Amino acid sequence: MTTIIELPEVLANQIAAGEVIERPASVVKELVENAIDAKSSQITVEIEESGLKMIQITDNGEGMSHEDLPLSLRRHATSKIKSQSDLFRIRTLGFRGEALPSVASISKLTIKTATAEAEHGSILVASGGKIEQLEAVSTPVGTKIKVENLFYNTPARLKYMKSLQAELAHVVDVVNRLSLAHPEIAFTLISDGKQLTQTSGTGDLRQALAGIYGLNTAKKMIDISSADLDFEVGGFVSLPELTRANRNYITILINGRYIKNFLLNRAILDGYGSKLMVGRFPIAVIDIQIDPYLADVNVHPTKQEIRISKERELMALISTAISESLREQDLIPDALENLARSSTRSFSKPEQTSLPLQPSQLYYDPQKNDFFTKETVVSEDSPQGFNHEVLIDSDVKQVDNLQVTKTESEAAAPSVKYASRPDPMLSDGEHPGLDVHNKQKLSQMLDRLENEEQSVFPELDYFGQMHGTYLFAQGRDGLFIIDQHAAQERVKYEYYRDKIGEVDNSLQQLLVPYLFEFSGSDFINLQEKMSLLNEVGIYLEPYGNHTFILREHPIWMKETEIESGVYEMCDMLLLTNEVSIKTYRAELAIMMSCKHSIKANHSLDDYSARQLLLQLAQCKNPYNCPHGRPVLINFSKADMEKMFRRIQENHTSLRELGKY
């Protein structure tokens, strides 16, 4: 008696669904790709409960005939290839005939479809892969597919679904990638009756970028174009000043298909060279047209991983295209645009002003217990920040106020203002080897900081500075050289650590609320994790599509830090996911202390330098910055005498050493 049997078709489809359909986003991907292959110009995706309850895809494509409709649920039944040779010149997104049978086997499926030639349309209803209804019906040309109760008969898969917000974020990401791959198609995504994404379908990729990432982001994207005998490369990449904390904003398309490829990602970064900060990544949409013979898409069940012939040549083409496009741009960030980040789009941009090329002079304000610069004139009652950049911000805001006064009769004062992301190019790379998102390094750093013990700091007498970076002081134990950035970073770290640790319900109302823009998937993920932000006193409310509004801020955060601080905290939250409040606050203290400390090449006057040393002496651990770097080094009197050979460890003569 034989023990090998042929599995029933429904069971085989359920097994195949385990590879093809991982989550609701997989269903959306497969069905939308079918709609694209059907030459649709409008595709609407509607979901309920993140797709677990209902997914409906409506298109205006070619549709299916009454005879073809039941065949579409047969495994490996397809209209896209007919012979073995077709497998090597695939230009459609689907070709295996697995998607619809797999979806039908684990859900209740309803298909309404009609072709332009048919007198009437057709409706098909299937449950668990079995057709229950097939009849004629009146319906517009195109196809409407409704998937209900996904995974109802595979409880193990349903059990391991993530939260509804997480699954919704995956759906949004899929629709966004497909929208970028096909800007000629008008996409609409509706979740529980609320529209999340909409693109115009004009064929303009930059317009699609604006619909997904926001207008401000699209304005800072530059187009790339290059070609050789085998490849055509086009698309858009962000200026080096516009970056993100992970690679999720890089989209690679081959013949209209979104793929994942580590080497091509590497080629994009290589195109930027040293223009990107460590741990930062660009926003990029790279559209590659390739002869189908050079690409094998029949590798992975989801077809997101493909094999490419001449991959090294393609990498070089992408890198060259990006580097040449960047070379043509003026990569010096607009000073007033960076400094006047709080100005709204309703105001005209002021003319560029030239800044004097002279060393920055930092001074100490004993009343505010902080440093400031005299490069610009600051009113006595203007808020003081932690470094010279913030002070210049204060001046720019005063200029903006003057502008409002002049145009008051023409336009009312804004009720909200768009926040700008911090420019990573403003950083001086004090810690290029440390990525705060490296969890292993971060965990070790936090453990060390948590176990610090109170230290005794020597009494120092400051007497000079070198290269605007190192302070010189003498004490009972000899000469001390202090790294001024590391010193104030330690001071600021302990300040922020204590302040953030005191987070309570004390909030300060903003006169003009801030708006913070995010991509669709990040917006949804942040909504799910909003309670973590609330723990540190950040309360963001949804305000339109992909936008949050901030109406008040915690008292420990100065108003001049709101834009950069909130964006940085959100980026950190998106990356760390399950971070504890304790760890989150420690990460925040480290991050803010580094960004708000004195940088290299800033000259300190004598009074300011002495005040910094006094603040350092009051720290719990004044000897290391939060990253573990030494704050100061010591040359004892004996060390100095040895270096100048005033004393020797032994009295062996040169003659005895054989020198003479």
Curated annotation (Swiss-Prot):
Sample GO molecular function, one term: ATP-dependent DNA damage sensor activity
Gene3D superfamilies (UniProt xref): 3.30.230.10, Histidine kinase-like ATPase, C-terminal domain, MutL, C-terminal domain, dimerisation subdomain, MutL, C-terminal domain, regulatory subdomain
GO annotations of cellular component type: mismatch repair complex
Keyword DNA damage: yes
GO biological process, one term: mismatch repair
Keywords for this protein: DNA damage, DNA repair
Matches recorded under Pfam families: DNA_mis_repair, HATPase_c_3, MutL_C
Covalent S-S links between cysteines: none
InterPro entries attached to this UniProt entry: DNA_mismatch_repair_CS, DNA_mismatch_repair_MutL, DNA_mismatch_S5_2-like, HATPase_C_sf, MutL/Mlh/PMS, MutL/Mlh/Pms-like, MutL_C, MutL_C_dimsub
Superkingdom of this protein's organism: Bacteria
Cited function: This protein is involved in the repair of mismatches in DNA. It is required for dam-dependent methyl-directed DNA mismatch repair. May act as a 'molecular matchmaker', a protein that promotes the formation of a stable complex between two or more DNA-binding proteins in an ATP-dependent manner without itself being part of a final effector complex.
Protein family per UniProt: Belongs to the DNA mismatch repair MutL/HexB family.
Protein known as: DNA mismatch repair protein MutL
